[in-house]
Regions:
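ALDH superfamily catalytic-core signature
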Residues: 223-228, 250-252, 256, 263-355
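Hydrophobic/aromatic ligand-binding patch that stacks against planar heteroaromatic rings
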Residues: 197-199, 248, 278
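Hydrophobic face of amphipathic alpha-helices that form TPR/SEL1-like repeat modules
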Residues: 1-64
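Residue-level signal for inorganic ion chemistry
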Residues: 61, 97, 202, 234, ...
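Conserved small-residue-rich beta-alpha loop and adjacent elements
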Residues: 155-231
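A structured beta-alpha segment of the ubiquitous adenosine-cofactor-binding alpha/beta core
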Residues: 168-170, 235-258
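Glycine-rich loop-to-alpha-helix module at the N-terminal edge of alpha/beta enzyme cores
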Residues: 49, 53-55, 61-154
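C-terminal segments
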Residues: 1-25, 129-156, 169-172, 260-267, ...
């Protein structure tokens, strides 16, 4: 078994650094063109002609891409492609599947690093640091750690014991059918992980990205294809509304949903899946992460300056648009009296827009 992976190192992007210069050049390149983003179904690019624009959130007049939206026909084709691809994908075996995503991690940490970071900065208005820890480091870690632990399914997680005269065996199989991955706008890493984690263990997926992060998500889709992902294993279907989602949820081969988003949306998915059970070949697995609240607890002997920085960054980095953002603080009265003026002053210096 390969050695336990290390976390991907975080680059600083300090002034004068090589990575900063490379990132700036890639941002300039991406801003100089308008990309046509297709659906990707069974490895083929489908330009539907039904388009929406993807703009820079902090500069609405700048168009990054024209997105060709999936309709009912494309969603049905994506579901069928996923079903038809599964047998060969299973036959490939875990080790070869792991190798594809480990190669994707290697590409993301090297030649695709600037591409992923630049697209996330432009598409989701993240800083270089926020993009680096998300689009690169976290997704690299997902792919490497997922592969590492997937290899341990048999030997480590469920060891077998066979008494004399008895032969016990375990066969770990993927779900029969496709997984619908519905991904969020705020983390490129989660968007890449939701379809690829089930794919690693032999499932196939239909990936419906958030309308607000299609540009960066398409970069990740292209990266996985360059790493050797076979056609049909993950099908990329940007679209809108409940109409195309319902087509997947009501497909007899729908086997599961992998979701990150709002609690209300997830509740709605449960209800719609329940109403479609009579049409499904099996009981689908429903896995979801919804909105959370984070907090800061300060010790009476804490470093006051460090606390102020933690409160500012925890609450306001990426505009607080993440479940790990701090929305509550528990601070001893003695500490609060000494930091409140500085904290209020620093909050007043925060500006909105392109820095």
């Amino acid at each position: 078994m390969p050695d336990h992976p290390d976390n991907e190192p975080i680059l600083s992007y300090a002034p004068g650094s090589a990575e900063r210069a490379e990132l700036q050049a890639e941002m300039d390149r991406q801003m100089s063109e308008v990309v046509e983003i297709p659906c990707v179904i069974n490895g083929e690019e489908i330009f539907t002609g039904n388009t929406m624009t993807q703009v820079i959130p902090h500069k609405h007049g700048h168009v990054l891409a024209n997105v060709h939206l999936a309709g009912p026909q494309e969603m049905e084709a994506a579901c069928q492609a996923a079903v038809e691809a599964q047998a060969n994908w299973i036959e490939m075996g875990l080790e070869e599947r792991c190798a594809i995503f480990e190669k994707a991690a290697d590409l993301l940490s090297t030649t695709w690093r600037a591409k992923a970071n630049a697209s996330t900065m432009l598409n989701q208005s993240k800083t270089a640091f926020q993009a680096e820890i998300d689009a690169v480091c976290e997704l690299v870690d997902f792919w490497r750690f997922n592969a590492y632990y997937a290899r341990q399914f048999h030997d480590e997680f469920q060891p077998l014991h066979s008494p004399e005269g008895v032969i016990n065996s375990t066969e770990i199989r993927p779900l029969e059918g496709f997984v619908l991955a519905i991904t969020p706008f705020n983390f490129t890493s989660i968007s890449g992980n939701l379809p690829s984690a089930p794919a690693l263990v032999g499932c196939t997926a239909v990936w419906k990205p958030s309308r607000n992060s299609i540009f960066s998500n398409y970069v990740i889709m292209k990266l996985m294809m360059e790493a050797g992902l076979p056609p049909g294993v993950i099908n990329f279907v940007p679209g809108s509304g409940e109409a195309i989602t319902s087509i997947a949820l009501e497909n007899p081969h729908f086997a599961g949903v992998h979701f990150t988003g709002s609690t209300n949306t997830f509740n709605g998915l449960w209800e719609r899946i329940a109403s479609a059970l009579g049409n499904l070949a099996s009981y689908p697995r429903i896995v979801g992460e919804t909105g959370g609240k984070d907090f800061v607890v300060a010790h009476p002997n804490c470093d006051h300056r460090a606390l102020v920085i933690a409160l500012l960054r925890g609450a306001f980095e990426f505009q607080g648009q993440k479940c790990s953002a701090a929305s509550r603080a528990y601070i001893p009265r003695s500490v609060w009296e000494s930091i409140k003026d500085e904290l209020v002053e620093e909050v007043g210096r925060i500006t909105m827009g392109d820095a």
